[in-house]
Amino acid sequence: MAVQKSKPTRSKRGMRRSHDSLKEITLSKDKFSGEMHIRHHITAKGYYRGKKVI
């Protein structure tokens, strides 16, 4: 089993955890339908950038 040589510092622990926080979802308004959707995702009606994809 691998064993560390020395205890990681508080700084290294913090740097490792820096990406663990939850981020707020960015919503965008579709230009064509006016519907709100998650950025870079299709709308609930199946449109992406004004084109029907589903």
UniProtKB/Swiss-Prot annotation:
Region (Disordered): 1-24
Xref: InterPro entries: Ribosomal_bL32, Ribosomal_bL32_bact, Ribosomal_zn-bd
A GO MF term: structural constituent of ribosome
GO process annotations (BP): translation
This protein's GO CC annotations: large ribosomal subunit
Record's keyword terms, sorted: Ribonucleoprotein, Ribosomal protein
Similarity comment: family membership: Belongs to the bacterial ribosomal protein bL32 family.
PANTHER family recorded: 50S RIBOSOMAL PROTEIN L32, LARGE RIBOSOMAL SUBUNIT PROTEIN BL32
Protein name listed in UniProt: Large ribosomal subunit protein bL32
